[in-house]
């Protein structure tokens, strides 16, 4: 029963709003219409070397957090997909990016793959526990590519197969 479910993460409470935090790494004097979005289900990534190296090379980077920062126990992956969609929507509609590329580092790889699958053909209406998270109604915005860095299977075992077709795709996105 959805009326019995109240989101308590992301400072949501009964307000119906979820608070998300992130850090844009935007180099000066390097305009871009492409954003590289790093997101992990339960941690932030701005202190890792790759986001800062990409920004230093002139690329626009967002290190986005979900509503579960540093909280693996409370994680609901379906909600994290909704959070990722909110970041993508913000990047396109409010910040003017034409292309958004997901960069899946570690658990972000399985998150990016899950997001990509659900945006293209949404099937999830509830969590395995029966919590109401309807991705078929979430209107997840599209992405223009996915890059995997040290991605792994994840707890949910969502990342099972790689295809060699991904080699060289980054050149097409730039």
Residue ranges, per PLM feature:
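N-terminal cap/lid segment of alpha/beta-hydrolase-fold proteins
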Residues: 1-34
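Active-site glycine-rich loops that stabilize anionic/oxyanionic intermediates
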Residues: 33, 38-45
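Hydrophobic beta-strand anchors of alpha/beta hydrolase catalytic cores
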Residues: 36-38, 61, 146
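Solvent-exposed loop/turn segments at secondary-structure junctions
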Residues: 42-45, 68-70, 107-109, 153-155
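Conserved alpha/beta-hydrolase
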Residues: 51-73
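Catalytic nucleophile-loop/oxyanion-hole region of alpha/beta-hydrolase
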Residues: 67-101, 121
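Primarily recognizes the serine-hydrolase "nucleophile elbow" in alpha/beta-hydrolase
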Residues: 90-93, 99-173
């Amino acid at each position: 029963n959805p009326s019995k479910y109240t989101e308590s993460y992301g400072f949501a409470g009964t307000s119906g709003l979820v608070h998300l935090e992130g850090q844009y790494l935007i180099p000066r004097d390097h305009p871009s219409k492409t954003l590289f979005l790093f997101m992990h289900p339960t941690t932030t990534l701005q202190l890792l070397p790759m986001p800062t190296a990409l920004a230093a090379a002139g690329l626009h980077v967002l290190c986005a957090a979900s509503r579960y920062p540093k909280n693996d126990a409370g994680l609901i992956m379906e909600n994290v997909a909704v959070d990722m969609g909110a970041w993508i929507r913000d990047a396109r509609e409010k910040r003017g990016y034409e292309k958004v590329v997901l960069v899946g580092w570690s658990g972000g790889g399985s998150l990016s793959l899950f997001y990509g699958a659900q945006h293209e053909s949404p099937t999830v209406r509830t969590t395995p526990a029966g919590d109401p998270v309807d991705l078929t109604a979430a209107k997840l915005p599209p992405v223009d590519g996915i890059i995997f860095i040290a991605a792994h299977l994840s707890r949910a075992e969502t990342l099972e197969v790689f295809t060699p077709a991904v080699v060289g795709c980054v050149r097409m996105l730039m």
